[in-house]
C-alpha cells in the first residue's frame, strides 16, 4: 500500500448523457468500487443532477472533467450544487489571477452555504498553446475514434495546421504555451488559489518523465522547475529584464495575445539585440581573420579577400 488514492477517470464528453448510459455507468462502476476506488471523474453534470450516482455511491469523491473548460465562479457553484466535490479548472486560468482570486469567493460560498469544501485543480504542464482555438476539436477527434488502433490527433496530417505549425512559424511560441511559469516561486504563487496541481503525462512518455523531474526539482527547492528552460534562456542569451517584465504581465494576460503582444515584444527585442551582437562579433572575427573557414576555401584564387571570406 502506498497511501496514494486511486482515481478512475471517465472524461469522454462525447458519450451521450442519456439515462441508459447512466444506468450502464452506475452498474459497471461497482467493479471498481468493490476494489476500493473512491474517487472518480464523471463527464456529465446532467448525470450528477439526477442524484443517482451519489445515491448508489455516497462515499465517492466526484471530480468534474477538465474538458468542460470551467472558467467562472458561477460554473463552480452550479457544479458543486450538482454534486461535484473537486473542480478541474480550464488551464487558461493560470494567466488570469483576477479570476483565480474571485474563485476563492465561490469556494467560501460552497463551504458556507452548501457545506462542501470544494477542491480546485489546475493543469500545469500540458505544453499546449494557450487559449487554443482548436482545443475542443482536438479532444473531439481523440474521443470519437471508432477503432482502438486509430492514430491520436497529433499523429494525423491535419493536426499540422494547429500546434505543430504554430511552433514552427511563431518565434514567440514557447512563451505562449499554457504551462505554469518555470520558477518555483510562480508555482507557489498559484498554489495560493488551488489545492492540487494537475500534472500531464498519461498520453506521452516524454511528458511523464518531465512531470517526475518537475516533482523532484520542486521537492529539492530548485529555483527553476523546468530543466530545459534555464539552458534555453542561456543559449539564446535572453535578457533578465525582459523575462521579469513577461512574468509580471502574464499573471493577468488571459492569453489575449491579440491585445497584449508581450511575448512577441520580448522575443523580437531579444532577437534583434542578438542579431546585432552576432553581426558585431562576425565583423570583429573577420578583422582578426578568425572563422571556421577551411584552408582550401581560404586560398581559392580570386574568390574575394581573406577578411570577407572569414566574415561570410
Question: Which residues are covered by each model-predicted region?
Answer:
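Active-site neighborhood of glycoside hydrolase catalytic domains
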Residues: 81
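Active-site pocket-lining/capping segments in soluble small-molecule metabolic enzymes
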Residues: 1-75, 84-312
Amino acid at each position: 500500500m502506498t497511501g496514494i488514492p486511486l482515481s478512475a477517470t471517465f472524461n469522454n464528453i462525447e458519450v451521450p448523457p442519456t439515462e441508459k448510459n447512466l444506468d450502464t455507468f452506475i452498474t459497471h462502476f461497482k467493479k471498481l468500487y468493490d476494489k476500493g476506488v473512491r474517487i472518480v471523474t464523471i463527464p456529465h453534470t446532467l448525470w450528477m443532477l439526477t442524484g443517482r450516482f451519489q445515491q448508489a455511491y455516497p462515499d465517492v469523491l466526484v471530480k468534474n472533467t477538465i474538458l468542460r473548460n470551467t472558467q467562472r465562479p458561477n460554473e463552480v457553484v452550479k457544479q458543486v450544487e450538482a454534486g461535484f466535490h473537486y473542480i478541474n479548472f480550464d488551464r487558461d486560468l493560470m494567466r488570469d489571477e483576477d479570476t483565480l482570486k474571485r474563485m476563492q469567493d465561490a469556494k467560501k460560498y460552497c463551504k458556507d452555504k452548501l457545506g462542501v469544501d470544494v477542491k480546485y485543480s489546475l493543469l500545469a504542464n500540458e505544453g499546449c498553446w494557450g487559449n487554443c482555438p482548436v482545443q475542443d476539436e482536438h479532444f473531439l477527434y481523440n474521443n470519437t475514434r471508432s477503432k482502438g488502433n486509430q492514430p491520436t490527433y497529433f499523429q494525423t496530417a491535419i493536426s499540422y495546421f494547429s500546434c505543430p505549425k504554430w511552433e514552427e512559424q511563431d518565434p514567440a511560441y514557447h512563451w505562449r504555451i499554457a504551462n505554469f511559469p518555470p520558477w518555483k516561486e510562480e508555482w507557489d504563487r498559484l498554489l495560493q488559489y488551488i489545492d492540487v496541481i494537475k500534472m500531464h503525462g498519461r498520453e506521452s512518455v516524454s511528458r511523464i518523465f518531465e512531470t517526475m523531474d518537475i516533482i523532484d526539482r520542486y521537492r529539492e527547492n530548485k529555483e527553476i522547475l523546468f530543466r530545459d528552460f534555464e539552458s534555453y534562456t542561456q543559449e539564446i542569451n535572453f535578457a533578465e529584464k525582459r523575462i521579469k517584465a513577461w512574468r509580471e504581465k502574464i499573471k493577468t494576460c488571459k492569453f489575449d495575445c491579440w491585445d497584449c503582444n508581450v511575448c512577441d515584444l520580448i522575443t523580437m527585442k531579444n532577437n534583434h539585440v542578438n542579431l546585432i551582437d552576432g553581426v558585431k562579433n562576425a565583423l570583429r572575427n573577420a578583422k582578426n581573420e578568425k572563422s571556421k573557414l577551411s584552408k582550401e576555401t581560404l586560398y581559392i584564387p580570386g574568390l574575394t579577400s581573406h577578411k570577407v571570406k572569414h566574415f561570410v
